């Protein structure tokens, strides 16, 4: 169970990082 929570945390962190990077690049392109 602890392993599943850790894996889920890593997955959410990676998804959040990708989303922030995508939004940043898109904002730069709009400017």
Swiss-Prot record:
The keyword Thylakoid applies. Keywords: Chloroplast, Electron transport, Membrane, Photosynthesis, Plastid, Thylakoid, Transmembrane, Transmembrane helix, Transport. GO terms for cellular component: chloroplast thylakoid membrane; cytochrome b6f complex. It comes from the Eukaryota. One of its GO terms (biological process) is photosynthesis. It is a single-pass membrane protein. It is found in: Plastid, Chloroplast thylakoid membrane. The chain crosses the membrane at residues 5-25. Coiled coil: none annotated. Its main location: plastid. The keyword Transcription does not apply. GO terms for molecular function: electron transporter, transferring electrons within cytochrome b6/f complex of photosystem II activity. The 4 large subunits of the cytochrome b6-f complex are cytochrome b6, subunit IV (17 kDa polypeptide, PetD), cytochrome f and the Rieske protein, while the 4 small subunits are PetG, PetL, PetM and PetN. The complex functions as a dimer. Component of the cytochrome b6-f complex, which mediates electron transfer between photosystem II (PSII) and photosystem I (PSI), cyclic electron flow around PSI, and state transitions. PetL is important for photoautotrophic growth as well as for electron transfer efficiency and stability of the cytochrome b6-f complex. Belongs to the PetL family. This is Cytochrome b6-f complex subunit 6. It comes from Chlorokybus atmophyticus. The gene is petL.
């Amino acid at each position: 169970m602890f392993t599943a929570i850790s894996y889920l945390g890593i997955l959410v962190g990676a998804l959040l990082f990708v989303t922030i990077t995508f939004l940043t690049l898109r904002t730069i392109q709009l400017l």
